[in-house]
């Protein structure tokens, strides 16, 4: 057994010192290098957890891999849960990657509720984080939404815990190899039918080759800047959202001319106003709202199934009757 891993890592120590070690947790255990590393890391930090493995049956070897994981957990005295959903061929679905993810997270949520687990540990690492950030850049995400995955975030009311986000993949592999720990090489992670695999196998190597430098660390730095920007924007936005009132038509967000002098903040305030009503506004929609506010013209716009009324000095989300 690996008794200590990264014991001088201050970020890890800070993460684990904030956890309640009297509680029990789930570990999403795929059998790959990342989740196995995390399994031994949790043991070394005296975290009480149960491993859960989802065998989709996509590979001929997956049944044996699940059995091997069960045996390993028994050897390490780790409680183990095996889930086998109805088999689906990954080549038969256009959205199998996201569908599988949704299935896992719903399973984790159900187990946490049924068995009183306090959260789920996930093995996402620095390379995964960089992929997430680059994907969001290409998708045109707002500058305040480029922070990537969070070390702790809530899925509904269950905590998702990602302590490895600052650790590069190669360090995880090196640590396991140095202790002669075997792990699964999931070929679906290299299947370029999936976007993540194409980014991992083709895009990142190409960009690093052309750029001539490591691109992971600059992307992680961008995520850090985005997180700080998001915190600042939220602080600046809060006073404006406190002014939201209910009137005879619906929710009213008063907009003063002073705010319109800062377009970036004005559009962010409107964005958060809509989000608070579970409405996701595109950049073009926010720009349209801002343009009408600037000119003082009245407009009735549709946002999903709601009507948004833009008037001089205010935005109203009309009530549904």
From Swiss-Prot:
Question: Where is this chain's protein located in or outside the cell?
Answer: Cytoplasm
- Keywords recorded for this protein, A-Z: ATP-binding, Cytoplasm, Ligase, Nucleotide-binding, tRNA processing
Q: Which InterPro entries match?
A: Rossmann-like_a/b/a_fold (IPR014729), TilS/TtcA_N (IPR011063), tRNA_Ile_lys_synt (IPR012094), tRNA_Ile_lys_synt_N (IPR012795)
Keyword Ribonucleoprotein listed: no
Q: Which reaction does it catalyse?
A: cytidine(34) in tRNA(Ile2) + L-lysine + ATP = lysidine(34) in tRNA(Ile2) + AMP + diphosphate + H(+)
Binding locations of ATP = 30-35
EC nos = 6.3.4.19
Q: What class of enzyme is it?
A: ligase
Keyword Iron-sulfur on this protein?
no
Q: Which GO terms describe its molecular function?
A: ATP binding; tRNA(Ile)-lysidine synthase activity
Please report which protein family the annotation says this sequence is part of. Belongs to the tRNA(Ile)-lysidine synthase family.
Comment text on domains: The N-terminal region contains the highly conserved SGGXDS motif, predicted to be a P-loop motif involved in ATP binding.
Function field? Ligates lysine onto the cytidine present at position 34 of the AUA codon-specific tRNA(Ile) that contains the anticodon CAU, in an ATP-dependent manner. Cytidine is converted to lysidine, thus changing the amino acid specificity of the tRNA from methionine to isoleucine.
Official protein name in the record: tRNA(Ile)-lysidine synthase
Q: Which organism is it from?
A: Chlamydia trachomatis serovar A (strain ATCC VR-571B / DSM 19440 / HAR-13)
């Amino acid at each position: 057994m690996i008794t200590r891993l990264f014991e001088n890592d201050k970020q890890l120590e800070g993460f684990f010192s904030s956890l309640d070690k009297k509680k029990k947790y789930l570990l999403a255990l795929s059998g790959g290098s990342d989740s196995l590393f995390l399994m031994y890391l949790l043991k070394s930090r005296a975290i009480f957890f149960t491993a859960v493995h989802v065998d989709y049956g996509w590979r001929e070897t997956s049944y044996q891999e699940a059995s091997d994981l069960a045996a390993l957990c028994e050897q390490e005295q780790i409680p183990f849960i095996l889930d086998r959903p109805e088999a689906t061929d990954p080549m038969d679905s256009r959205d199998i990657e996201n569908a599988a993810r949704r299935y896992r997270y719903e399973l984790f949520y159900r187990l946490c509720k049924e068995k009183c687990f306090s959260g789920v540990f996930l093995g996402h690492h620095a390379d995964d984080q960089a992929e997430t950030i680059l994907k969001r850049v290409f998708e045109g995400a707002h500058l305040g939404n480029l922070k990537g995955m969070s070390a702790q975030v809530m899925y509904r009311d269950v905590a998702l815990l990602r302590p490895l986000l600052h650790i590069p993949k190669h360090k995880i592999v090196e640590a396991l190899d140095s202790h002669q720990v075997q792990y699964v090489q999931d070929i679906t992670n290299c299947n370029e039918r999936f976007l993540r695999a194409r980014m991992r196998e083709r895009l990142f190597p190409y960009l690093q080759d052309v750029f001539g430098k490591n691109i992971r660390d600059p992307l992680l730095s961008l995520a850090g800047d985005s997180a700080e920007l998001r915190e600042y924007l939220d602080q600046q936005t809060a006073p404006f959202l406190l002014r939201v009132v209910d009137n005879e038509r619906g929710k009213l967000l008063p907009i003063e001319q002073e705010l319109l002098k800062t377009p970036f903040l004005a559009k962010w305030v409107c964005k958060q106003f809509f989000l608070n009503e579970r409405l996701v506004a595109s950049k073009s929609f926010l720009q349209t709202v801002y343009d009408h506010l600037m000119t003082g013209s009245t407009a009735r716009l549709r946002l999903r199934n709601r009507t948004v009324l833009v008037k001089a000095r205010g935005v109203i989300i009309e009530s549904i009757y």
